[in-house]
């Protein structure tokens, strides 16, 4: 006779499964994205952000972003199992079945949409839905496998969060929010290309046409350097239109110089670890840049 499972035996399995679901949402990526959402919200009003749209907006956008990440896991599950960086993900490892993953992704996205539509505003709900489709279907399912410019074109979906935060509070599209989108859109290619250089052989193995695979490492390094210069220019736009003050100007200039320096090192020095250094620096660059935007907004623009 088979012995029934005890609570002490069942609980670890449930915990592991929920950890797998949580991992599918790419929490670190979503956390950085939510920072840009929050900054978009704060910059949209001169004073304190209204609590209700702030909480509901952050929750709804987070759920739909997590859903998009889960769809990414689903679509990429076969190639993930062949790459060293991703073979340990829940689906390749069999921690979650495909059916359960689909149910989770659809449920999380639907709940997020309902929250945004009913508790925030329809504009934010539909824009977030468009971003989900852009990332999960247009980028992951098509562009990623179709062109070496996948990151450039598909980067628009990933650049939307500050605009979503802005519309969550104001219920309107504003030019200032679009400037923040331009910054992230320009930041995305050098960020991902640096990682792609480090993982070039893995991408080639699974036939993903990342730029280092199709055009070579040296060409990619040149593109990274050029894009960091373009990003430095994009980061000045909020100052040029009067959106930000000297705190942001100084902070963004220092960050831009640092990014250009790292890209210059990558281009002209042949150290294997430099590509990952650029990749990691780019994450800190975006995070600190948006924190500086927030500080400038409250301690200078509205002082």
From Swiss-Prot:
Catalytic activity: heme b + (2E,6E)-farnesyl diphosphate + H2O = Fe(II)-heme o + diphosphate
E.C. no: 2.5.1.141
Chief place of localization: membrane
Location in or out of the cell: Cell inner membrane
UniProt KW keywords: Cell inner membrane, Cell membrane, Heme biosynthesis, Membrane, Transferase, Transmembrane, Transmembrane helix
Enzyme class: transferase
UniProt entry tagged with the keyword Transmembrane helix: yes
One Gene Ontology cellular component annotation held by this UniProt entry: plasma membrane
Pathway of action: Porphyrin-containing compound metabolism; heme O biosynthesis; heme O from protoheme: step 1/1
Gene3D superfamilies on file: UbiA prenyltransferase (1.10.357.140)
Ranges annotated as spanning the membrane: 29-49, 51-71, 96-118, 123-143, 150-170, 177-197, 223-243, 244-264, 281-301
BP GO terms, sorted: heme O biosynthetic process
Gene Ontology molecular functions: protoheme IX farnesyltransferase activity
Topology relative to the membrane: Multi-pass membrane protein
Similarity annotation: Belongs to the UbiA prenyltransferase family. Protoheme IX farnesyltransferase subfamily.
Miscellaneous information on this protein: Carbon 2 of the heme B porphyrin ring is defined according to the Fischer nomenclature.
Function of the protein: Converts heme B (protoheme IX) to heme O by substitution of the vinyl group on carbon 2 of heme B porphyrin ring with a hydroxyethyl farnesyl side group.
PANTHER family: 4-HYDROXYBENZOATE SOLANESYLTRANSFERASE, PROTOHEME IX FARNESYLTRANSFERASE, MITOCHONDRIAL
Protein name: Protoheme IX farnesyltransferase 2
């Amino acid at each position: 006779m088979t012995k029934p499972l005890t609570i002490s035996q069942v609980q670890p399995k449930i915990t592991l499964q929920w950890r797998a679901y949580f991992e599918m949402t790419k929490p670190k990526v979503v956390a950085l994205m939510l920072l840009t959402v929050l900054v978009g919200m704060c910059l949209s009003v001169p004073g304190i952000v209204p609590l209700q749209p702030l909480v509901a907006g952050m929750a709804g956008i987070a759920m739909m972003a997590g859903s998009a990440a889960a769809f990414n896991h689903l679509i990429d599950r076969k190639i993930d199992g062949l790459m060293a960086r991703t073979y340990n993900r829940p689906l390749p490892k069999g921690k979650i079945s495909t059916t359960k993953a689909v149910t989770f992704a659809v449920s999380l996205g639907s709940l997020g949409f309902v929250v945004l539509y009913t508790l925030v505003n329809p504009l934010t709900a539909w824009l977030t839905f468009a971003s989900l489709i852009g990332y999960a279907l247009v980028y992951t399912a098509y562009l990623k496998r179709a062109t070496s410019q996948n990151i450039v074109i598909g980067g628009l979906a990933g650049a939307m969060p500050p605009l979503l935060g802005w519309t969550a509070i104001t219920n309107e599209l504003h030019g200032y929010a679009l400037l923040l989108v331009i910054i992230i859109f320009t930041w995305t290619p050098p960020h991902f290309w640096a990682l792609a250089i480090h993982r070039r052989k893995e991408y080639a193995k699974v036939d993903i046409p990342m730029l280092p695979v199709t055009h070579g490492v040296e060409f990619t390094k040149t593109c990274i350097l050029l894009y960091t210069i373009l990003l430095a220019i994009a980061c000045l736009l909020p100052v040029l239109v009067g959106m930000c003050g000297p705190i942001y100007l100084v902070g963004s200039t220092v960050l831009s110089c640092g990014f250009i320096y790292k890209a210059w090192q990558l281009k002209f020095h042949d150290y294997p670890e430099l590509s990952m250094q650029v990749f990691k620096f780019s994450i800190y660059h975006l995070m600190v840049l948006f924190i500086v935007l927030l500080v400038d907004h409250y301690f200078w623009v509205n002082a």
